Amino acid sequence: MSGKILDKMAGLLGLEDDLEEDLEEVEEETVEEEVTPLISSNTKRNNKVVSIHTAVSAKVKIIKPCSYEEAVDICDELKNRKIIIVNTTDLETKIAQRLLDFMGGASYALGGSLEEVEKSVYILAPSTVEVTNELKSQLISSKGIFNWNK
């Protein structure tokens, strides 16, 4: 009975419509949406076991090119993730420079490295191999392997 009196008073003051609108908004907000799982439980799980500790033997290939045309074969070996030592001592200087430019571009494009081991001898390494040359830094810092000027 007291609820009816309050409803009538709220109706006279104009509050009843606001209460109904608030209730409708709450009801609209609580509308449940059907959620579909990203992975259904009915699908078969394809677990693939991959060995993390694989013993892959690194292969080093030593090449002494006779012409510039062998540059493509050398870079194909680098693409196959092999370490290549290239000896260009028998090539003319201009041809050796062209070969070196080609190999340098290929190693850069593949993320590898090209280092000079000795005069006219280079090592091409893929991105998975780190080449350090500590001997070269020692030579630069001490101006020779043996420091005779003490």
UniProtKB/Swiss-Prot annotation:
GO biological process: one example: FtsZ-dependent cytokinesis
Keywords: Cell cycle, Cell division, Cytoplasm, Septation
Cell cycle is among the record's keywords: yes
Taxonomic superkingdom: Bacteria
Location in the cell: Cytoplasm
Pfam family, one: SepF
InterPro entries, A to Z: Cell_div_SepF, Cell_div_SepF/SepF-rel, SepF-like_sf
Gene3D superfamilies given in the database record: SepF-like protein
GO CC, alphabetical: cytoplasm
PANTHER family (alphabetical): CELL DIVISION PROTEIN SEPF
Family of this protein: Belongs to the SepF family.
Function: Cell division protein that is part of the divisome complex and is recruited early to the Z-ring. Probably stimulates Z-ring formation, perhaps through the cross-linking of FtsZ protofilaments. Its function overlaps with FtsA.
Protein name per the record: Cell division protein SepF
Organism encoding this protein: Clostridium botulinum (strain Kyoto / Type A2)
Source taxonomy: Bacteria, Bacillati, Bacillota, Clostridia, Eubacteriales
Primary gene name: sepF
